[in-house]
């Protein structure tokens, strides 16, 4: 893929990962788009905090525009948000982010969007996996140090932060949990399932069949997608069967397939082991147990709170709409139940819900989801600054980047 052009503010880096190349037996690469702060060249003495904005494969650093919206753009219509001219709105808010980013009172930080496409998906979920390889270690210990050195970042755990939505929301929380000392806070919006008792509409530990409710007299299909008034858009069976048509052995490029590739063990055929029979929906309890022990974030926090708790105090922030399109709010409720009852220490973070808000809601109680989803950076940068002010260790550089 030919990368987009660099600009004054946006740079591109690409490295060959030794860890991933060894795992795959051929050269494997990681890339990142880097958004530099205002005044980067004029302040060579400054060292910056680093923000990792996780999400799907970034063709470029989207949502950042140095000019007002194109006056000649033909307006489109967003069916999802019932919004005329949403393409113009997107450009408007990209320009507003540029104005915010360059304003005198905005804290100067570096933001990156990581490219970690792999043979199964456009994204690795930024953790180590039997099927995908050590993407978590490669990003945390190879790519990020390279970027920090190249772009004068502080390069310490207290000065690294994570945020993202949907896939990026799971990654933000998952990376914080698996690398608790390497990052100082995560802001996870509408995360993919963080408790597999609410794996969208399935409890993979107790349910027998993923496609139908466990009822003795009839087959009631489990939903997979809905709108914000609860109308079902498609079923889980339909979603999984579509992926079977698109590709074999978890190679459809679809959502269910990548979850199995990341969360599951290697199967007997060398491909990811299915969590359930894709034709019938019958759940494999052995695969489910592997998922629980290795990637069920709520379960892992409960199991390991004695060691993880002190390292994660104040670092976990989760946001979701209570009408998430893919039922992802249900797992957040279960996570909240755990975290609000933690002791020694209390988790001391934040969980918030958007009333009747759908997918991608990020904690903004003052704007509709159509707009708040375009303001992730403005939502979380002030929270990151507050976290630094509260938690930076004695002697830490909290001033060179405040110009």
Positions of predicted regions on the chain:
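Non-catalytic cap/lid and distal C-terminal segments of serine-dependent acyl enzymes
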Residues: 1-403
């Amino acid at each position: 893929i030919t990368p987009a052009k660099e600009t004054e503010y946006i740079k591109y880096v690409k490295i060959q990962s030794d860890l991933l190349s060894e795992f795959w037996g051929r050269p494997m690469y990681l890339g990142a788009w880097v958004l530099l702060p205002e005044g980067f060249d004029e302040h060579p003495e400054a060292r910056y905090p680093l923000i990792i904005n996780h999400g799907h494969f970034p063709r470029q650093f989207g949502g950042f525009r140095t000019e007002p919206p194109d006056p000649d753009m033909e307006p489109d219509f967003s069916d999802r948000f019932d919004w005329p001219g949403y393409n113009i709105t997107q450009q408007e808010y990209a320009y507003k982010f540029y104005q915010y980013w360059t304003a005198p009172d905005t804290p100067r930080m570096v933001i990156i969007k990581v490219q970690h496409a792999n043979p199964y998906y456009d994204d690795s979920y930024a953790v180590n996996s039997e099927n995908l390889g050590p993407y978590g270690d490669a990003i945390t210990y190879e790519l990020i140090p390279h970027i920090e050195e190249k772009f004068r970042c502080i390069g310490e755990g207290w000065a690294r932060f994570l945020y993202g939505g949907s896939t990026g929301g799971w990654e933000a929380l998952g990376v914080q949990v698996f690398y608790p000392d390497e990052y100082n806070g995560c802001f996870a919006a509408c995360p993919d399932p963080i408790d597999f008792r609410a794996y969208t509409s399935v409890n993979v530990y107790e349910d027998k069949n993923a496609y139908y409710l466990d009822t003795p007299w009839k087959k009631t299909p489990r939903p997979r997608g809905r709108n914000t008034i609860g109308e079902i858009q498609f079923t889980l069976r339909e979603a999984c069967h579509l992926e079977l048509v698109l590709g074999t052995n978890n190679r459809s490029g679809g959502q269910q397939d990548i979850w199995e590739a990341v969360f599951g063990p290697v199967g007997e055929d060398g491909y990811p082991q299915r969590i359930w029979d894709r034709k019938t929906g019958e759940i494999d309890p052995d695969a489910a147990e592997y998922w629980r022990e290795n990637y069920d974030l709520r379960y892992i926090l409960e199991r390991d709170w004695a060691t993880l708790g002190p390292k994660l105090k104040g670092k976990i922030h989760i946001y979701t709409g209570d009408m998430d399109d893919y039922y992802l709010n249900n797992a957040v409720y279960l996570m909240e139940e755990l975290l609000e009852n933690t002791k020694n220490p209390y988790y001391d973070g934040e969980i918030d819900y958007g009333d009747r808000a759908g997918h991608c809601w990020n904690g903004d109680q003052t704007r509709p989801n159509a707009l708040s989803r375009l303001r992730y950076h403005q939502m979380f940068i002030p929270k990151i600054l507050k976290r630094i002010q509260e938690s930076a260790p004695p002697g830490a550089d909290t001033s060179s980047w405040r110009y």
